Amino acid sequence: MKPRGATELQMEMLEKHVSKELLDQVQICTSIPGKVPLDPNKLNILWQKNSWDQPNLQEFFNNKERHKEYDWYVFNSHWNYEKFRMIFDIPTERSLVIKNGIEYFPIRKIYKRGTPIKLIHHCTPWRGLNVLLRAMQEVENPNIILDVYSSCKVYGSEFSDNSEKDFEGLYEQAKKLPNVNYIGYKPHEYIKEMMPNYDMFVYPSIFEETSCASALEALASGVHVITNNFGALYETCAEWPVYINYSKNYEQMAKDTGAAIDVAASYLHEGFMQEHLEEQQKFYKRFYNWEKKGM
């Protein structure tokens, strides 16, 4: 199985929305300099989605002479661009931001009071699953159930074979919790189709995101989001979620997340919340849809 994470999905979208004739004029390398060879006959673009602190970026970006190798640097968020600008003094005159896109805007689920409240978490396990499972132990409302699709398989068979064992303990913990269903890996198309069946996406991140495809998928589906303000999440999610303040004290962050889930469950049926989610979906269709034409 080949990798099909956010980087691969965004490349698929780019190939869908940009003509082959135009794409043939550029050489795009995603995130890791040199992963795709430089082409002297094309514009060479580094499409940077990784965080500034990744070990495989340090040698290239700390050497300013090497910054000349690419004609353009494209970043997936203003947060990410600002980090590279500030830390590595990248060539700002050859940099720009193109945010990740989303193109699935299904009919939004309208929650009815008294029905089960379904939560989804479909991020890779090192990004905060440990905090979320601890948070679910704090949730008091018996009507709340969390489905966990967390897995390493999204990054391909080789990565999964080498890494999945490191998180077996978390998966086992998830299977034992009464208000959690551990489902594991499902293809992106499955997650996308199932998203409108959920009421909340919960993500207490401990991984500095440069953007967040999982959050975008939930927000664009009109799903209520509970997350924190770590990394670029506050840019991707704007003013739509309930934000828990990021803390290195994971126990406290888990308790705060659990409390936020219970509070959100108490107002999910209210008219103001349904209006909020409707406007949320419109926002992402307006600003993150790559089908938008030039103005």
Regions found by a protein language model. Name each.
Residues 112-128, 133-138, 146-147:
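Conserved donor-binding/catalytic core segment of Leloir-type glycosyltransferases
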Residues 4-9, 248-252, 269-295:
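A charged, aromatic-enriched C-terminal amphipathic alpha-helix characteristic of glycosyltransferases
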Residues 79, 101:
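Carbohydrate-associated surface elements
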Residues 196-210:
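Acidic donor-binding loop of glycosyltransferase active sites
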Residues 224-227, 234:
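Short hydrophobic beta-strand element within catalytic cores of glycosyltransferases
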Residues 1-38:
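N-terminal pre-catalytic "stem/leader" segment of glycosyltransferase-like enzymes
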Residues 160-186:
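Nucleotide-activated donor-binding/catalytic signature segment of Leloir-type glycosyltransferases, i.e.
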